[in-house]
Amino acid sequence: MEEPGAGFILNMTSDSKVRAIVGRIRGLAAKTVPPPEMSWFDSQFDPEDAEGPFLPFSTFLITGTAGAGKSTSISALYQSLNCLITGATAVAAQNLSNGLKTYCPTIYSAFGFKSRHINILPRHGRNAPARDMEGIQRNELCKYWPVISDILGEFTKKKQRGQYEHLTGAAFGALAKMGTPTLWTTNIIVIDEAGTLSSHILTAVVFLYWFYNSWLQTPLYKSGAVPCVVCVGSPTQTDAIQSTYNHSMQKHHIQECDNILTFLMKHEAVSRYVDLNHNWALFINNKRCTDPEFGHLLKTLEYNLDISPRMVDYIDRFVVPKSKILSPLEYVGWTRLFVSHREVKAYLTALHETLSLNQGGATAEADARLFTCPVVCEVFTDTFNEYREAVNLPGLTVTEWLQKNLCRLSNYSQFIDQDLSAVHIETGEESTKVTYLVKYVKNSYVSLNGKTKKCICGFMGTFEKFKTILDNETFIDAHSHDQPEYVYSFLNTLLYNGMYAFHKHGLDAGDEGYLDALRRLPIPPNITHLSTFQDALDQTEAALLNPESDIFYHMTCAPPSASSASLSTLISFYMSLKSVFLQRLALAVSRFGRDFAERTFQTFTINMMIQNGVDFTSASERLFGLLGYASNVDTYKLKGYTFIPVGFGRFNQAELSRDLRDKMPVVVVEDPHGFIACLENNVNKMTEVMENGDLIHICTAGDYGISSKLAMTIAKAQGMSLSRVAVCFGNSKFVRKSHVYVAISRATDPRHMVIDCNPLKNLEEDREDNKTSKYIVQALNNPDTILVY
């Protein structure tokens, strides 16, 4: 029997403490109060002018060393309690989705934040400093009220007032279990990586919980169930920033602000109200990487301990020349981490130039082909002129505005990281259309940046892999919850179209004996269109006259569509096609050996050709397949693109003009099981919010909604575990401790981590970190704190 690893043992020893965490959170969630009167908060209310009722809440804090199991402990909460699991960032939400095998939204998405709210500026808050919890809550509410009030307006239009007023608690509980948790179906809200959120987000979550439940008149509101916000993260790893945009200067202003974790620790009135001394759990030992010296290093940074010469020497062993990290030909397949977006873009540009010269030959990637796809932006003339007048910049041109706002255009896709260049500008009366080319690498891994529709249209893998999928019925189990007839119809089409692969191999091998045996394999009667023995003879003779022709297609019917056949008929057809596939595979393996099962097998819903390795083309006028939403759980491998029109089931959507939509292909990706899917293009609307509150829709941009995993900023990697990581701290004279901490703690194995310098030799003195560490050390000495080793 294999001996359990150190990480497994550490997780098992922490089991009892995690149970204690679940128990305390369950106790907090059971608290009730007289429901606050929410009718105060109507469309005329503003916390800057009037004081509303205090909104009770409770919090539980989970902090600790990077990789110590903070995020993993969330799975215990998910299994034990009815709770809404969210991430502070898209990456954190994706990691949670991956671990829990369920959809976890960002906290912004959970409370109703939309892309248009990005440009609504937070206020500075009331001038008078608040010393009690009521005043602090009002101050925090003031900061975010412009966004909150807009969310309230949209919610009250969409949801009927008193919608759940007459439901019993049991009926409401059953209804809540049928769907995904929301702010009005549970009072336990978990936020992973909460250290990246500004403090006012906590108050926004509390306020919107009470407002939503009051508006819908849920049993939660009527019973006065107090929201329990579980904040997970590390205050020494992360910073919260606040971004504002100066329209007159066309420039971003970014400044640090209190994050939720430090807000709970530092403000005495807040920590006393939430009883932080009793509602705090600290995870101590790193379980992501169980190397003792590595774990000691992380604890030293976490608790702001003195850095010994021995520790500096330990870090020296990871240092390699910066040129090796920046060279795409070194450390192939490793994820690069950089401090700034500019460095990420520079590395990707260098990688793409190397690939264009080597065509993947020197990169140890069998098919790392470089290809480009257009990204399009359409700036509307009338609204752009209105914007120029509003900000008093009459000389501002479209190209200048685009150059300064390109990173803001993509709310999800992070244009600024991508290697793209403008190739075409077309100016018309109604709009200016700008086309950029963005470079991608075939077979590189990408993540999705939003909720993306997909159309599964094929399979690329091996015969053995497809057989395993059929035997285990994993695909059917994963996709047949709502309309199983479409799943069976899709698989029938793949099986039917894929049968020719067996015949083609026999032709290429020139093996007449194998082809003859293939013809003799029986065909189930429910999939054949032949009614008499003479019909069978005629079709066999026709097939023999054309050696390229597979007799299977002469003898069988094309699979019926999901709309024209019953589920039982589709399942019967599937079982027969599966039987034929397995018989053909067994025959081929017996004839050509076990190696045949590992040969490439490709099948699509239409007759597909792949030109230049990346361009999926067909004589068919439309590409159809199984529709669904692409999973944030999965990492996708980029395979190419297609200009074949794909039906994503959306109608009357014209965010982009027709000629721009025609310029953009859809990207083709492979999921972890080998199924090929097209991803719907991502469309972003750029709406500026003026100081007087007016909304101006200036521009619409179309992109692909994907981010490369070849390189990213250290901030974006927050919460990730990376098997091979190369960190470049750049040319900064001083390195921030939080950057060092996050970057090196991503590694799961110190043997597969390299850095370009020893950051411990030039750490930036950060007084804020020292303050935070003081509270953490106090918690370590507090007997009421739950310590998880």
UniProtKB/Swiss-Prot annotation:
So what EC number does this one have? 3.6.4.-
Domain of life, source organism: Viruses
Locate the residues binding ATP: 64-71
> Which molecular-function annotations from GO does this UniProt entry contain?
ATP binding; helicase activity; hydrolase activity
UniProt keywords, alphabetically: ATP-binding, DNA replication, Helicase, Host nucleus, Hydrolase, Nucleotide-binding
Disulfide connectivity? Answer: none
**Localization, UniProt:** Host nucleus
- Protein name stated in the entry: DNA replication helicase
Its taxonomic placement starts with:
Viruses, Duplodnaviria, Heunggongvirae, Peploviricota, Herviviricetes
Which gene holds the coding sequence for this protein? HELI
